[in-house]
């Protein structure tokens, strides 16, 4: 009688129970497996029953029902045949994979041979590369605008510029009125003489939303 072993891993249990079956190549009933295998392996009957099911799932142990009883058996040749079948299956799969690779390689080579170099294709490739370069530049530029301090600086510059434009507009308007009252120079003649456009007007403060948009210009009274 073998000494009971404790702490065997599932793989060790399967190996020990398989060894029990292969030691005498006998067909066992459920009761015989649980009692005799328990003595041989040092496992409890419950452990033997659980391990037996794992070996059945692995295809190492065969089982069949005769009458009201289940019988179990496993011969060394079973494992050999199982491994042999797996080798055959994997060999077949490898062969099919190689054939697919060869087939796809031929298709690729055929497509390459059919692809005719032309001036149009060359230009399109150059255009594509240019677009890729532009896209990269735009992305780099967008990263600059992700800097909040830079955005704040731009907003401040815009406000200063608008204030300056409105100051100059005020000065021009005052000078136009002065020339009209002092020298009887009509505003239209004044504008023509100094190249001032008829639509010159004050600028309204800029609205800074999530996406800055210019506000329509309105005339100041």
UniProtKB/Swiss-Prot annotation:
Disulfide bonds: none annotated. GO terms for biological process: reciprocal meiotic recombination. One of its GO terms (molecular function) is double-stranded DNA binding. It comes from the Eukaryota. Belongs to the MND1 family. This is Meiotic nuclear division protein 1 homolog. Residues 89-146 form a coiled coil.
């Amino acid at each position: 009688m073998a000494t009971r072993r404790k702490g065997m891993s599932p793989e060790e249990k399967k190996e020990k129970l398989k060894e029990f079956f292969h030691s005498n190549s006998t067909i066992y009933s459920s009761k015989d497996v649980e009692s005799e295998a328990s003595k041989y392996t040092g496992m409890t009957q419950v452990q033997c029953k659980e391990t037996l099911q794992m070996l059945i799932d692995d295809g190492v142990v065969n089982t069949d029902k005769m009458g009201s009883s289940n019988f179990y058996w496993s011969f060394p040749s079973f494992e050999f045949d199982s491994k042999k079948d797996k080798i055959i299956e994997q060999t077949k799969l490898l062969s099919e994979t190689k054939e697919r690779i060869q087939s796809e390689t031929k298709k690729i080579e055929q497509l390459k041979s059919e692809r005719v170099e032309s001036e149009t294709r060359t230009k399109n490739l150059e255009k594509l590369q240019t677009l890729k370069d532009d896209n990269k530049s735009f992305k780099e530029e967008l990263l600059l605008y992700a800097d909040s301090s830079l955005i704040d600086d731009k907003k401040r510059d815009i406000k200063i510029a608008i204030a300056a434009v409105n100051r100059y507009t005020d000065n021009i308007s005052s000078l136009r009125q002065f020339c009209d009252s002092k020298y009887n120079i009509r505003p239209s003649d004044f504008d023509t003489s100094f190249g001032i456009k008829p639509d010159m007007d004050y600028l309204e403060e800029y609205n800074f939303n999530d996406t800055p948009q210019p506000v329509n210009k309105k005339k100041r009274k």
